[in-house]
Swiss-Prot record:
Top-level taxon of origin: Eukaryota
Topology term for the membrane: Single-pass membrane protein
UniProt keyword annotation of Membrane present: yes
Sequence positions bearing Phosphoserine: S109
Disulfide-bond pairs as recorded: none
Provenance organism: Homo sapiens (Human)
Subcellular location: Membrane
The keyword Phosphoprotein is assigned to this record: yes
GO terms for cellular component: membrane
Protein known as: Reprimo-like protein
UniProt cross-references to InterPro entries, sorted A to Z: Reprimo_fam
Segments crossing the lipid bilayer: 67-87
Length: 120
């Protein structure tokens, strides 16, 4: 481990067990503040607006702009998907009505029947 993280000169042994058992506990003379002070980013993890507080102001503005871009992209993609869906449904309904219109108009005329009977 990192020698600055654990103070090897002040490690305590547990129940007389030597070796690596004390190394896992660390130095008990240091308080919680010392352990937390060694880690970077002592600020809270999130600000009140939901943006990660550990970011620099430039990174915060970049993060906000990325979130805004993602939101706009999602709205536009949903608009396109629903537009294609409703346009397709509308075209399907129109084509079905046109097919029904053509089917009703395709009936044999009386002249064709008379010509067929006249040949026999």
């Amino acid at each position: 481990m990192n020698a600055t993280f654990l103070n090897h000169s002040g490690l305590e042994e547990v129940d007389g067990v030597g070796g690596g058992a004390g190394a896992a506990l660390g130095n008990r003379t240091h308080g919680l503040g010392t352990w937390l002070g060694c880690c970077p980013g002592g600020a809270p993890l999130a600000a009140s607006d939901g943006v990660p507080a550990g970011l620099a102001p430039d990174e915060r503005s970049l993060w906000v702009s990325r979130v805004a871009q993602i939101a706009v992209l999602c709205v536009l993609s949903l608009t396109v998907v629903f537009g294609v869906f409703f346009l397709g449904c509308n075209l399907l309904i129109k084509s079905e009505s046109m097919i029904n219109f053509l089917v009703q108009e395709r009936r044999p005329s009386k002249d064709v029947g008379a010509a067929i009977l006249g040949l026999y």
